[in-house]
């Protein structure tokens, strides 16, 4: 049986063939972890058609050498001269580099070690999730589900957004998460009109809607869900109740639309059309969703501009929203595992407002 590491290396080798390149240089923490399953904050990984080598500094060297599969050769990193020497000794003249992670600070150095380089969107290599990645994401979602179940009962009038946000953070760790996958968004009342509102000392009131967007990390992989709950039993705003129903309609339609025959933009349109053909047409102000994995936002996107087909075993969010200035907002976000026909609704058991 081919190991997951070998499958990932094959993905990179195919990328080399497609771009007629000699090697790919990986400097991002995310892609180093993706390939080696070894977390580190620095290092350079080079993959050729027949070699894989990791240059890593003294903080990680011994641990990496003992942990990482011997398919990947590990060398103590001292200076970039080692990487240049490796390229020269292996006849590497054309490098692929991670345009979505590397900064201009490295441009001169890369030009010095290689005659030619091609910038790629390196997140694309992680679009298809392997079984261990899916399992980690499923576990992260389940931890988030447990917190959401408690959260719905926990929220009470007179609590502040900040207090609720801190409770979410603590509870995610209690339930087995490593840490937040991002700072929780908690927005009550009028604050809900800001999609990325930062929690404040605003007090939760009876009859308000409160949007809670949060997730955790498990074994290096993220979850990301949003629920807009009602505080109490009767909403103060009939318009926001109507908005909730419309967002939920769009959310469910988007979840059901996800499969490998549609592009990200086509799924976005399914959700967007429902809202734009309603009284709330001016209040959906962001994309429908995004990929989730090692990064909280990664490929593929579910947006008006993403015209690639969704790939089997990709993981995406479906998160339509309505945001009405000076009134409030509604967002419902779920995670979906893409399949050829009927995709898997990973967050189906996470409670909703009604």
UniProtKB/Swiss-Prot annotation:
Mn(2+) 1 binds at residues 224, 290, 319, 333. Binds 2 manganese ions per subunit. InterPro entries: Creatin/AminoP/Spt16_N, Creatinase/aminopeptidase-like, Creatinase_N, Pept_M24, Peptidase_M24B, Peptidase_M24B_aminopep-P_CS. The keyword Nuclease does not apply. One of its GO terms (cellular component) is cytosol. It catalyses: Release of any N-terminal amino acid, including proline, that is linked to proline, even from a dipeptide or tripeptide. GO terms for molecular function: aminopeptidase activity; metal ion binding; metallopeptidase activity. SUPFAM superfamilies: Creatinase/aminopeptidase, Creatinase/prolidase N-terminal domain. Keywords: Aminopeptidase, Hydrolase, Manganese, Metal-binding, Metalloprotease, Protease. Mn(2+) 2 binds at residues 213, 224, 333. Gene3D superfamilies: Creatinase/methionine aminopeptidase superfamily, Creatinase/prolidase N-terminal domain. Belongs to the peptidase M24B family. This is Putative Xaa-Pro aminopeptidase. It comes from Mycoplasma genitalium (strain ATCC 33530 / DSM 19775 / NCTC 10195 / G37) (Mycoplasmoides genitalium).
